[in-house]
Amino acid sequence: MIGQITSGLFGGHDDSKKVKGTVVMMNKNVLDFTDLASSLTGKIFDVLGQKVSFQLISSVQGDPTNGLQGKHSNPAYLENSLFTLTPLTAGSETAFGVTFDWNEEFGVPGAFIIKNMHITEFFLKSLTLEDVPNHGKVHFVCNSWVYPSLNYKSDRIFFANQPYLPSETPELLRKYRENELLTLRGDGTGKREAWDRIYDYDIYNDLGNPDQGKENVRTTLGGSAEYPYPRRGRTGRPPTRTDPKVKSRIPLILSLDIYVPRDERFGHLKMSDFLTYALKSIVQFILPELHALFDGTPNEFDSFEDVLRLYEGGIKLPQGPLFKALTAAIPLEMIRELLRTDGEGILRFPTPLVIKDSKTAWRTDEEFAREMLAGVNPIIISRLQEFPPKSKLDPEAYGNQNSTITAEHIEDKLDGLTVDEAMNNNKLFILNHHDVIIPYLRRINTTITKTYASRTLLFLQDNGSLKPLAIELSLPHPDGDQFGVTSKVYTPTDQGVESSIWQLAKAYVAVNDTGVHQLISHWLNTHAVIEPFVIATNRQLSVLHPIHKLLYPHFRDTMNINASARQILVNAGGVLESTVFQSKFAMEMSAVVYKDWVFPDQALPADLVKRGVAVEDSSSPHGVRLLIEDYPYAVDGLEIWSAIKSWVTDYCSFYYGSDEEILKDNELQAWWKELREVGHGDKKNEPWWPEMKTPQELIDSCTTIIWIASALHAAVNFGQYPYAGYLPNRPTVSRRFMPEPGTPEYEELKRNPDKAFLKTITAQLQTLLGVSLVEILSRHTTDEIYLGQRESPEWTKDKEPLAAFDRFGKKLTDIEKQIIQRNGDNILTNRSGPVNAPYTLLFPTSEGGLTGKGIPNSVSI
C-alpha cells in the first residue's frame, strides 16, 4: 500500500542530483504499549527531523579511504510526515520524505546506514527510493527496531531487497554483509540488554530456581547424553546463588522483559493480547481468588451439568472491591471478559466444538477413536505390526514390559477375522503410550496424579472408521522396576458397571494422550526443535541470502513465545506442571523422548510411513498411499506438504542449479554445520542428518523446517480448545486408580458413575486453569500472518520467486476448497464424526480469535 501511494508522490524528479525517498515508521506505543514511559508518539515523530540520518551505500562506487567498501552518500534527514496509514490491525504507520544528494558515479545503492540520535527507539518499516537514475525503484524491507546509536557498537545497516548468494554479492557490499553477521553472533559473553540483536545458544538451565528450595530444583536439559535437548536462545543472566550451573530467573512480574533479540519480540497486538499478561492474570490473580472462594466447598464437579455451566452460565461471583481491583489490574480485553461480574459468570468460556452439537457424543467409542485421526493429537497412532505388542524398553532395567493383550480379548470384534488376518489386511492399529510413560510412572504416582501407562488397540472397519478393541492399563511392579509391570486389559461394553469401567479406561488413555500431546507433540516437536533453526539462520545466513528470505517468515515470534514459556509455562511450578499429569517430571520426560527425535522423520510422508499408516507408492499423488483412507490430518496434511515442497523446489531451483553451487555457498554450509553441531548439538553425531551437498537435500530440509513451523504446529495447537476445552473429553490428570470390586469407590461407581468419573479426572480448580490456558493458546491474534502470505509484498526483487510464491498462494486456496468439499462428504465419517465437528485444523487461512482453523507461518503462540 505504501509503495503504491509513494509511486504517485515521487514518480519523477526535477533535479538529477537529488533522489527522493519514503521512510515508513510505526508508533512505538502502538507496538509496545507495555513501555509507556518512553513511548514514541506522533508528536515526537514531528520533531525527529535532524535526529535521524540516512546514508546510502553504493554497490558500484568504492571508497578508497574505507578499504574499497561501498561509498557512503552524504547524510539525509527525515522531512515532514507525508501521511499516516491506519491498517485494520490498528498499527499507525507514518511515512516521511527523505532526499539524498546524488551523482552518476554513485550508481545503485545496495544498502543504507541509519543513525538515531533521538532519546528513544522507533520501529523502521521500510525505505523506498522511487527513481534512482538508470535503475528505477530500490526498496529496503526493514521491519526492525532502531535504538539510539549510543546503544550500538556498530552501525545499523539495512540491505536492499535484491537477494544474493555469498559469491554473487557485489564486491563493495561483501564486508558489510560479513560484518552484520558478526554483529548478530556476538561474542558469547555478557548479559543481554533490551536493545541487543544478538543470537546465541544456551542449554535449558533456567527452568528451576534452587535459591527457592529443593522443590524448585529442575534437571538441566541439553549438554548431556542422559538429558539431550535442543538449544534455546542465550540471555546471559547470572547464575543462581545456590548452583552456579543454573541460570537465575527474572521475577514473574518482569516476565515481559525476558531477553530475546529485539526484533524477535512480539508485535503490537500479540504483546497486548497474549502470553505473559494473560497467563500471569490467570495464575496470579484468578487462581488464588478461586481458591479462597472454594475453600468452603469440595474441589469437585458434582455432575456433567456442573461442568457445562462453565460454558452456559459460568461461576457466579459477588460484586465487590476485590474483583473490581482485579479487573482494573488486567489490561487485556480477552481476560477482562473472563472477569465479568455484571450477572454473568467470572469464568464463562465459549462452548467447545466437541460439545456444541451434542453434549454426550464425545463419550462414544467412535469419537474416542476418531480423535486419534482428526483431533488435536493425530500424530501418534500407528499400525500394529506385531501381536501382542512388544516393548522397546531395556528388560534389564524394566523387566518384561510386553503387552498382556491376547487374541481372546479382541477376536470376537474383528468381523470374523483372526488377529493375523486382520494384521495382514492392515486392519489393526495402536495408540501406544506405554514406553514413554513407564520409566517415570512410579515417580509420577507419588504426586497427586494416580494414573497408568496405556496401550489401545483399534480395528479399521469397512466404513473407514476405527473401533476400539481393548485398552491395557499398566503400573510399575510393586516389587521394583526389574520385575516389569502389572497390567489389566479392558474391553468395550455398554452394560452395567462394566460400561462405567470402560469409560474410565478411555479417560486414563485420554490423560496419557493429553500429557504426551502437550509436552511432546506440541512443545518438544514444534516449539523446542525449531528454535535452533531460528538462531542459526540469523547467525549464519545474511538477510541477503535467498534461504534466509525463504525461511524468515516461519520464525516470527518463536523465540519470544518460547522465552515466555520458559518463564511461566514449562518452568518449575509453572502452568504446564500445574495442569498435566507428569507434574514436575514433565520437561525431563521430554528430554528422554528427544533421544529418539530424527529430523528427516519430521517430514510428513516419512512420519506416516514410519508409523505404518502409509506405504511408499510412486503412483500416488504425494508419493505415499494411506492405509487409513479417511485420515483427515494425513489427507489434508499431504496436500499442504506437497504445496510447500513445490514452492520450496521452485524457489531453491532458481538460485541453485548444481551440487557445486550448494557446496561453495559458505554461508549455507556454516548454517547447516552450526545447526547440527550446536543448535541440535546433542545429536550432532547422528548418521541421519542430511549432508547438505545437493539442491535436493536443501529442498527437503527447508520443506521440513517450514512444515514443522507452520502446518504441524497448527495441527497440534489450534484444536486444543475445540477438543480439550471440555475437560471430560481430554482430562489432563487422573487422581485415583480404577475402582476395584468391594471398595467404596466401586460402589460409588455403580451408584453414581458420572460423579465417580469426575472425581477421577482433573479437579475443578485445575480444570479452570487448564481451560483458561488452552483457550488462550488456541486463539489467533488479528495480526497473524498465514501460510502463503508475507508481511511485505516486496520481500524480494526477483520476479520468478515472486511468481512461484503467487502460485503457492493459489494452490493453498484450492486446498481450502477441497477441505470444504471433503467435510461435506457424508461418506467420509471421520471428517466430522459423532460430535459433528468438521476437520479444519489444516485449513490454511483464518480470521482472528478462536476459530479452530488457520495455519500461521510460524510457531507464534
UniProtKB/Swiss-Prot annotation:
GO MF assignments: linoleate 9S-lipoxygenase activity; metal ion binding; oxidoreductase activity, acting on single donors with incorporation of molecular oxygen, incorporation of two atoms of oxygen
Top EC category: oxidoreductase
Cofactor(s) demanded: Fe cation
Record-given protein name: Probable linoleate 9S-lipoxygenase 8
E.C. number: 1.13.11.58
Subunit comment: Monomer.
Subcellular location: Cytoplasm
One example of a Gene Ontology biological process annotation: oxylipin biosynthetic process
Binding site for Fe cation: H522, H527, H713, N717, I861
Pathway: Lipid metabolism; oxylipin biosynthesis
Record's cofactor remark: Binds 1 Fe cation per subunit. Iron is tightly bound.
SUPFAM superfamilies named among the record's database cross-references: Lipase/lipooxygenase domain (PLAT/LH2 domain) (SSF49723), Lipoxigenase (SSF48484)
Keyword Nucleotide-binding: no
GO annotation, cellular component aspect: cytoplasm
Superkingdom: Eukaryota
Catalytic activity: (9Z,12Z)-octadecadienoate + O2 = (9S)-hydroperoxy-(10E,12Z)-octadecadienoate
Cross-referenced PANTHER family: LIPOXYGENASE
InterPro entries per the UniProt record, alphabetical: LipOase, LipOase_C, LipOase_C_sf, LipOase_CS, LipOase_Fe_BS, LipOase_plant, Lipoxy_PLAT/LH2, Lipoxygenase_dom_3
Residue span(s) of domain PLAT: 33-160
Record key words, sorted: Cytoplasm, Dioxygenase, Fatty acid biosynthesis, Fatty acid metabolism, Iron, Lipid biosynthesis, Lipid metabolism, Metal-binding, Oxidoreductase, Oxylipin biosynthesis
The gene coding this protein: LOX1.8
Function: Plant lipoxygenases may be involved in a number of diverse aspects of plant physiology including growth and development, pest resistance, and senescence or responses to wounding. Catalyzes the hydroperoxidation of lipids containing a cis,cis-1,4-pentadiene structure.
Domain (Lipoxygenase) ranges: 163-861
Family to which this protein belongs: Belongs to the lipoxygenase family.
Chain intervals for the UniProt region annotation (Disordered): 220-245
Main location, first listed in the record: cytoplasm
